[in-house]
Design a protein with these regions (language model features):
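Cleavable N-terminal signal peptides
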Residues: 7, 18-19
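Short, internal strand/loop/helix patches
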Residues: 91, 103-139
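Alpha/beta-hydrolase fold active-site loops
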Residues: 56-57, 88
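Sec-dependent signal peptide recognition
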Residues: 2-9
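Non-catalytic, surface beta->alpha helical segment in thiol-disulfide oxidoreductase systems
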Residues: 138-153
Length: 153
């Protein structure tokens, strides 16, 4: 019986993406304001959501220990390089161990978008798991959310 359960699991596992959203990101049911924050970036300076007002912000919650997060990073860098201007930015919010782990990872996998360090903001934002990405409007409203690895390129 145990073998049968394992075989069923292995047969179903490859189809899990068939039941996920057909869209890159899912619309938020109500465009509530994104919770504000003041976080320290890997640049050592404090940053807030308020300073991103006036532009679309793709905010990605990730961690260096999260394999899907690391696989997603090059696509975030790609969309950042394609769309970066006064109206759009990508921000990475690292959840978990501090600057040393982040800097070690980024030394081998550099990105040009800002990375902020968080210890508990994911609860305010309703992050169910990593990676989770939000698209925030220029007015600070949460428009879309993607849970799990995506290809943003």
């Amino acid at each position: 019986m145990k073998l049968l359960k394992i075989l069923l699991f292995l047969l179903i596992l490859p189809t899990q993406n068939l039941f996920s959203s057909p869209y890159l990101m899912d619309p938020m049911p109500n465009k509530k304001p994104a919770p504000d924050f003041v976080l320290v970036g890997i640049d050592g300076k404090e940053h807030s959501l308020t300073e991103l007002r006036g532009k679309f912000a793709l905010i990605n919650f990730w961690a260096t220990w999260c394999t899907p997060c690391k696989a997603e990073m090059p696509t975030l860098e790609s969309i950042h390089n394609t769309l970066k201007n006064d109206d759009f930015t990508v921000v990475g919010i690292h959840v978990g161990p501090g600057p040393d782990a982040i800097n070690n990872y980024l030394s081998l996998n550099p990105v040009t978008f800002p990375i902020f360090i968080d210890m508990d903001l994911e609860y305010d934002w309703g992050v169910p798991g990593l990676p989770t990405t939000f698209l925030v409007s220029p007015k600070g409203e949460m428009l879309y959310r993607a849970v799990g690895k995506r290809d943003f390129s």
